[in-house]
């Protein structure tokens, strides 16, 4: 349904909602932000019947928010009739692509219920960027995954992330090969259940055999891959692992560094700046403890720069 928009010359957009200049700016900086402010001004009475001021702000602070707000007006009654709470509507709509996600819940929700998914499951899947595609992917790939002994809970866990649709498709594509390579269904779910899960599964399929040949166990590989940026971390081990081992780091050390969000960057930082830190008296154990933290790459670079400045 098209977004209704009538310019009101006598009232600044957002004035009826008492938006501060900062709040207006927060909305305007998004794609379609001016349209969102105009829509709020024009549809103030209808919006405030179903949404609080905080709800409207939350939805409006995303790209294409006018369409999302219109979708709330279009579908709110249907959602209530199907047992969804207002909080569910806000969760689904408060993401990029919220309008499409709401429509997808209306279209696919009944079928998903028939397949055994609860309202809470549907909200969890839809409440992400790309939620509409993820709901459709559950319908498309769910039966195949069930036949392969993945539970409904597994499917929701995989689908309920940014990029969930791609992750489900990747499980269908790479799952059989990974199982033949010795990974369990639980391993595959763990790897897939992250933003970037599809890329992580592909990276395991691509680099897993090389890493196993170098002495890394599948448990280590699944553990590393099951983090945000897991695909990059596995590739970083393939690239930098041999050199780090030559410098006295053990595989356990490398896994410890890689097994974090930002693990790839941390490994690269140790590879590039480790020698300088060693020359300054830091032991490998010190460097590993420093690197095995989220955001460690920046800290290592900063420390190396400080040491360089003293020379």
From Swiss-Prot:
This is Burkholderia TALE-like protein 3. Core repeat repeats lie at residues 84-116, 117-149, 150-182, 183-215, 216-248, 249-281. Cryptic repeat - repeats lie at residues 19-50. Transmembrane segments: none annotated. The keyword Repeat applies. Keywords: Plasmid, Repeat. Belongs to the transcription activator-like effector (TALE) family. Bat subfamily. Cryptic repeat repeats lie at residues 51-83. Cryptic repeat + repeats lie at residues 282-311. Does not bind DNA, probably because it has too few core repeats. It comes from the Bacteria. SUPFAM superfamilies: Ankyrin repeat (SSF48403). The keyword Repeat applies.
């Amino acid at each position: 349904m098209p977004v209704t928009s009538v310019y009101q010359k006598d009232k600044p957009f957002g004035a009826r909602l008492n938006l501060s200049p900062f709040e207006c700016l927060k909305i305007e900086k998004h794609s379609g932000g001016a349209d969102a402010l105009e829509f709020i001004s024009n549809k103030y009475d209808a919006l405030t019947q179903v949404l609080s001021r905080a709800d409207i702000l939350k939805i409006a602070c995303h790209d294409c928010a006018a369409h999302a707000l219109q979708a709330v007006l279009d579908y709110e009654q249907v959602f209530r009739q199907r047992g969804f709470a207002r909080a569910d509507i806000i969760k689904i709509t408060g993401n990029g692509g919220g309008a499409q996600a709401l429509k997808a819940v209306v279209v696919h929700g009944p079928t998903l219920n028939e397949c055994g998914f609860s309202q809470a499951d549907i909200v969890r899947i839809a409440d992400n960027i790309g939620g509409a595609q993820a709901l459709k992917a559950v319908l498309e790939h769910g039966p195949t995954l069930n036949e392969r002994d993945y539970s409904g809970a597994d499917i929701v866990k995989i689908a309920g992330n940014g990029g969930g649709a791609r992750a489900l498709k990747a499980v269908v594509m790479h799952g059989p090969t990974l199982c033949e390579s010795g990974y369990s269904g639980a391993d595959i779910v763990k790897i897939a259940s992250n933003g970037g899960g599809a890329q992580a599964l592909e990276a395991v399929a691509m680099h897993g055999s090389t890493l196993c040949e170098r002495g890394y166990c599948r448990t280590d590989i699944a553990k590393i891959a099951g983090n945000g940026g897991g695909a990059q971390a596995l590739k970083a081990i393939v690239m930098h692992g041999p050199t780090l081992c030559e410098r006295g780091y053990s595989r356990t050390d490398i896994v410890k560094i890689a097994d974090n969000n930002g693990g790839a960057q941390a490994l690269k930082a140790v590879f590039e700046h480790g020698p300088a830190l060693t020359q300054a008296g830091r032991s490998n154990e010190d460097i590993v403890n420093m690197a095995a933290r989220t955001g460690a790459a920046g800290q290592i670079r900063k420390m190396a720069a400080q040491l360089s400045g003293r020379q």
